[in-house]
């Protein structure tokens, strides 16, 4: 059983300075783990910190779509095989909470107004998200991976979507294997240009690559993913956490990330 650990990223792309903001989320997850929280609880609450911070393109900081709407995606997966995701949710400042509520349901994902109605029935906050204008090169996703004292892992991701996209567009964040992947041995989360991440099925293939005898480490698998699966010029980053050891991050562009590992 590995020691407890947390790793989080604040999106691929230059954007505003956000390293200290990201560290606050890692600190929240750390405090929860030390108090006995599960990987799911710590990952969700750390992601909520990022959704509540308008510097990030997620939750309250979600960017406008082409029509001026703010539609939010989020996902969570656990090392025991559960998944929850929501797509294009309106009026939902913390979509990760809704996604997490799906973990124990007989459905994995919900979209749009159907997701909002389901969230209303579960008592999730329903209030307009003001949104903001896209910033050129803005980071497009937040992600948190946690390993708790039992060795269980959870990955939570959230986004307002890439800048300058139509209201029906779906990126990598809510798509298992693309924006995230968790199994019993490791967890991977991606950020950046969602179409390229999705075409590559990046998170799943990086995780699978780590099993290969040609691969020496998670970092080696991540480097392979960025170099071999992502086209030149596409800005993409990855974070990952194994069943032991510290989390690692790698990007072909600016990607703030922060981590903690139990002493």
Language-model features, listed with the residues they occupy:
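Alpha/propeptide regions of enzymes that mature by internal proteolysis
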Residues: 1-263
């Amino acid at each position: 059983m590995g020691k407890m650990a947390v790793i989080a990223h604040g999106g691929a792309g230059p954007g505003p300075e956000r390293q200290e903001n990201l560290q606050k989320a890692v600190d929240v997850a750390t405090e929860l783990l030390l108090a006995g929280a599960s990987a799911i609880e710590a990952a969700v609450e750390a992601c909520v910190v990022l959704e509540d911070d308008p510097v990030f393109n997620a939750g309250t900081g979600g960017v406008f779509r082409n029509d001026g709407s703010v539609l939010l995606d989020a996902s969570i997966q656990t090392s025991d095989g559960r998944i929850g995701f929501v797509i294009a949710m309106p009026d939902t400042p913390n979509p990760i909470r809704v996604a997490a509520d799906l973990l124990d349901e007989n459905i994995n994902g919900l979209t749009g107004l159907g997701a909002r109605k389901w969230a209303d029935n579960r008592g999730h906050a329903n209030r307009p998200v003001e949104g903001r204008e896209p910033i050129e090169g803005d980071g497009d996703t937040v992600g948190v991976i946690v390993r708790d004292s039992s060795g269980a892992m959870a990955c939570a991701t959230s986004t307002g979507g890439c800048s300058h996209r139509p209201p029906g567009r779906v990126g990598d964040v809510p798509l298992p294997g693309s924006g995230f992947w968790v199994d019993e041995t490791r967890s991977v989360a991606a950020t950046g240009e969602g179409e390229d991440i999705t075409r590559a099925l990046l998170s799943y293939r990086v995780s699978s690559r780590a099993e290969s005898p040609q691969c020496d480490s998670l970092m080696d698998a991540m480097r392979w993913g960025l170099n071999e699966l992502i086209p030149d010029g596409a800005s993409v980053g990855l974070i990952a956490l194994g069943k032991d050891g510290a989390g690692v991050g790698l990007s072909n562009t600016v990607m703030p990330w922060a981590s903690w590992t139990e002493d």
